[in-house]
Amino acid sequence: MATFTIHQRKLGKDKVDQINTDSNSDMANTYFRMGLVNGDNVDELVAATFDHDIYRMTTCLQVVSDHALTVIFDHMNGHTCDDVHNEIVLMKRPSMSVGDIVTNTGSGTSWVCMPFGWHELGMQIETKIAA
């Protein structure tokens, strides 16, 4: 059984106000680009998104499967998955979509959900739950 965390782009009122005030700001462009991410510079874009404090850890899952990313994607999109053994929802979350990050807490490996499939990141994602 492996434990995974899911980070999703979640904007508080202050970030929404910043985007509405200046939709061409670096933070706004980073947020929008992450929702349309393609194969170019994914690691740099993810790092910038964390720098702008846009990602939030929303969920922790324990999964038993050789196809954990598929199971997680299906589960996060409302499909019943017998391979998900435990779920901790840390905050209200949307379904899984492009730009969301899944991290295996044991190996430290992270993947970004892409328009088609997954991109393995070459960077470490913080998986500690803040007190």
Locate each region found by the language model.
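Short linear interaction motif-like sites in intrinsically disordered regions of transcription factors
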Residues: F32-R33, D51, R56, V112, ...
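Short, conserved turn/kink motifs that form compact alpha/beta structural patches or helix kinks used as
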Residues: D40-T103
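Short, compact, well-ordered microdomains
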Residues: M91-A131
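Intrinsically disordered, low-complexity segments enriched in small/polar residues
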Residues: T5, N29-T30, A48, D53, ...
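N-terminal intrinsically disordered, low-complexity, charge/repeat-rich segments that act as generic
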Residues: M1-N41
